[in-house]
Every structure is written in C-alpha cells, then in structure tokens.
Amino acid sequence: MIFDKGNVEDFDKELWDAIHAEEERQEHHIELIASENMVSKAVMAAQGSVLTNKYAEGYPGNRYYGGTECVDIVETLAIERAKKLFGAAFANVQAHSGSQANAAAYMALIEAGDTVLGMDLAAGGHLTHGSPVNFSGKTYHFVGYSVDTDTEMLNYEAILEQAKAVQPKLIVAGASAYSRSIDFEKFRAIADHVGAYLMVDMAHIAGLVAAGVHPSPVPYAHIVTSTTHKTLRGPRGGLILTNDEALAKKINSAVFPGLQGGPLEHVIAAKAVAFKEALDPAFKDYAQAIIDNTAAMAAVFAQDDRFRLISGGTDNHVFLVDVTKVIANGKLAQNLLDEVNITLNKNAIPFETLSPFKTSGIRIGCAAITSRGMGVKESQTIARLIIKALVNHDQETILEEVRQEVRQLTDAFPLYKK
C-alpha cells in the first residue's frame, strides 16, 4: 500500500538527494535574496500535515463539501490571527501567492482596461504592478510612476501631478526593490484627490509592518495585499486585508470562485502558525534586528567609493548596490557570489542602462541571515566579504579565502542543524 511508503529517502532516493542537497545549500550558504527567509520547523510541520488531503472549496461555515469542520477551525484561526496581527477588519488567507492576491484585489476594485498607476518595474516595482509581460499589464492600462532622478526616492508631488494627468481608477503602492519607507498616508491623499482606490502591496515589508517597525498601510489603503513568506517568515502564500466589508465580499468572490478552486488548507495552517509566531513580542525584536542588520550592511557599501548605494541608504530589509565600477554587470556579480556561497540576485537600478538579463546592480536583503541569529557584526563582515569577492573576482586564491570565511559564519550560526 502507498501508506507503507512513508520515508522519502527510502522510497524516492533520487528526489531525496535533491532535497538533501538543498538542505545542505541552505545550511552552508549565506542567503541574501530579499524575498527569501527561513521558516520554523513548526511552520514546516503544519504544511506537511494531513490537511493536504482535504478539499474545502468555499469559506469557513459555507463550504461546498462535507467533512470540513476541522479545516474550518484551521482557516478561522489563520483569519483571526491575521486580522489581529495587522489591525484589519477582514482577511482572506486563501490566495495561493502574492500574485494571486494582487489579481484578486484588481478584480475586486476595477474592470479590464481601466487605468492604474503603479510603480515602474525599473524603479523597484513588481511584475504584477503593470509589467507588459504580466497579466496585470495585459489586462489593465497601467501607467508607471518612477523615483526622483536625483534622490532615487519616491517624489509624492510628482506622483500627484502624474495622477492628475492620467486619472487612474486605482493607485498601487508597494515595491519589490525599494529600500525606503513608503508614506502610505500621502498615497491615500493622492488617491482621494483623483477619486481613485488605493491598493498597497506590502509583500516585502509585511513582517516589519506586523512588528510595528515600519508604517502600516492598513489604515490608509482600501485593500492591502501581501505574501506570507519574506519578512513575515511564513510559508509561501498570499494574504489580502481590508477594513471595508463590501470590498471584503468582493475579495472573497474574486479569490473563490473567481481565480481559485479549493484552498490549500495545509498551507493555511502554516500561515496560522506564522501569524502566531509574529504575534509573539519576540518577533518585534527580530524585525528590528532585520532593519539594524540591513542598515549596517548597507553602510559598509556606502563607505566604499567603488560601489554606489542606491538612494544613499535603506529604511527596511533591502538595499540595491550599483556594482559596475568593479565588475561588468549584476549578473556576473550574482554568478561570482554564488561560487563563494553567497546567494543574492542581480537587479535593475533606477534609470537602468543595461538589459534586465544583466543589470547594473545587485539586491541584498537581510531577513534570512537575521533568522539565523546573525547580528550587526556579522552583517558588516558579510558586506566586506562581498566586496572582497567582487573586487578580486579573477583571483581564485582570494575567492577561496572568502568561501572559507563564509563557511565559518554558517557553521557559527546553524540553521536547522542545531
């Protein structure tokens, strides 16, 4: 019987080897991809539970199948914890991803072809904020706003003037590669001025918002979307919040039956665990440590004139660095750092001149190293290791030194092998 095959290592050695290799990679590499984090064993246990067996189309108390009394408890726990965590009146925890959450929010607020003002991808926005290759850009008429050419920060007066000119039905705030705090109150004022809805995608900063170390968009946005991983440190999934009951009903209809069928109740259970973890007072210390570590790491680059820190600093978990003075492009930098077991990604910088497949910059985030227990000292050390590798990218002896120093750090701060 299939139930006898409970051990992946024995039943599927080929798959187990790949999983084990990834476990070793995470254990011994320094993870700086800003959209990644390290979940707790409790989150993984919930996601790997028998809840994966249960189909539950609909919502708690109103399902299309029987036998849902247990998953109703699970999903209700996730909903109530999300509401408490973010101070929202309504929460939908069924969205499979941040992209699904954004799609549902758009469906709830606007019609196909409507004009939307969103952050341009090159300035730090996300694919779902209107990229022409994404459903958002194909379905709606997106107009992109950028950052100031001098400060590389959002210019709210310029965004207001742009909103007046294009008269959007919806304004989208939020980013995937913007290192500064966003003034959601100003965005709401702009939206109100032109009679538009305001949607905030807080996927990257959700954990910081939950901990109260970053301003919350919930009091200002008509709808807030998020992922549940990244700084929130939960499973991969989506979340939608609102304080408007009428919009909550539209959101629920957009998620199911509009975009999805049965919810992933095992993932929702893992979300519930992550929300409980984030409600613990210790999570605020964790979130503040992310900000402290990111600032410390960014400062090392700011003090080295061979690199240019985009916008001059960071207020959150992420920052961008122009690396073209020391290496041809961000892609080469990413590949080189992979070789010394430091993982990050190439990233376009504002007013990029290179192709998106090469880029001038790299994006660095500190959520994952903070989850390992690393602090300001280690963050500064990692920055110096990155600089050492990039500046000496053709010196194998020096690159080997960096590999050894990386291994010393990861051994000192084990992930799951404790």
Curated annotation (Swiss-Prot):
InterPro entries of this UniProt entry? PyrdxlP-dep_Trfase, PyrdxlP-dep_Trfase_major, PyrdxlP-dep_Trfase_small, Ser_HO-MeTrfase, Ser_HO-MeTrfase-like, Ser_HO-MeTrfase_PLP_BS, SHMT-like_dom
Which GO terms of type biological process are on file? glycine biosynthetic process from serine; tetrahydrofolate interconversion
Localization recorded for this chain is:
Cytoplasm
Which NCBIfam families does the entry link to?
PRK00011.1
Q: How does it assemble?
A: Homodimer.
Q: Which HAMAP family match?
A: SHMT
Query: What is the protein name for this chain?
Result: Serine hydroxymethyltransferase
| Naturally occurring in which organism (per UniProt) | Streptococcus pyogenes serotype M1
